Structures are given as structure tokens and as C-alpha cells.
Amino acid sequence: MINSLRVIRAMINKEKTDILRNKKMLIIMFIFPVIYLFITFAGIQEFKGDGSAFVLMHSIMVPIQIIASIVAEEKEKGTFKMLMMSGVRAFEYIIGIMVIVMMFLVFGMVIFDQTGATKNSDTFEAVIVNMIAFILSMMIGFIIGVISDNQVSVGAVSLPVTLIIFFMPIV
């Protein structure tokens, strides 16, 4: 148990440095909060009000894209095999990545909350629903990352999946 916690903490630190070093990941993680922040402060009336569409995109699209990119990048570089051969178990790897990505996603949700995008919902209920959405989206991202051959193909695989998730309620 103690060894697992140590491995998970090491995975969190590794992923934190990888994410902070990769500007593309940071842009993807904060694109929707920043766009909503810009719209709010620019005073664009057409988009003012409820930011639920931005919150939805942040809760579904971002975790899928980020997790799939992380897994595909580590497969491509050979880091994934090295981690597995060094004794990192699958659940330690998954939890380590999910925790650090969840922290960044929650920070994005704080930006949404402070700018008023979530003003029409109960805060506790919104947090629970977003956490569930984050976890489910990250699991889908893990599957896409494992299926994808490399980091470039992640977008081609994740886009149809994301569109199906978004348009499923309409059908």
C-alpha cells in the first residue's frame, strides 16, 4: 500500500512536469475557460449569460483529448513500456495521471465559477456532476490513447467519439 502511494505520487510529479513542459496540453486545458473569460470581459452580448456550453466542452472534450494524448505520447516514446517494466502497475499509472489532470480541470472549473459561467446551478451538485463527467471522460481518453497508434492519430480517433457523445442526447 505504501509502495503504491509512493509510485502514484511519483507518477503525479512526472505528469505534472510533462504537462507544464508541453504548451499544447496547457492550451487545451485552459482554452474554454479563457475563451469564456474573454467573452465575459469583452462584453459580447450574444454569448453573455449561461456558460454551460463552455463548461460542457471543458468537462467532456478536454479530459478525452488530454488523457488520450498523454497515453499515446508515452506509447510513442516508449515511456509506457519502461514504466510497466519498472513495476508500475496499471492502476497506479491510471490514478497518477487522473489525479494531476483532475487538478488542472478543477482549476479550469474554478475559473468558470468565478466568472459566473455556473451561476445557474447548485455548486455542490455541479461539482459532483463535473467530477463524474471528468472521470468518465478520462476513462474514454485512456481507451482512445491505447487504441491510437501515435499522438497525431489521437485527434482523428477522439473527434468522432466526442461528436457522438455530444450529439447522443439529440438523437
Model-predicted segments: where are they?
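Hydrophobic alpha-helical transmembrane segments of multi-pass membrane transport proteins
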Residues: 48-112
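Alpha-helical transmembrane segments and their short interhelical loops
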Residues: 90, 98-155, 169
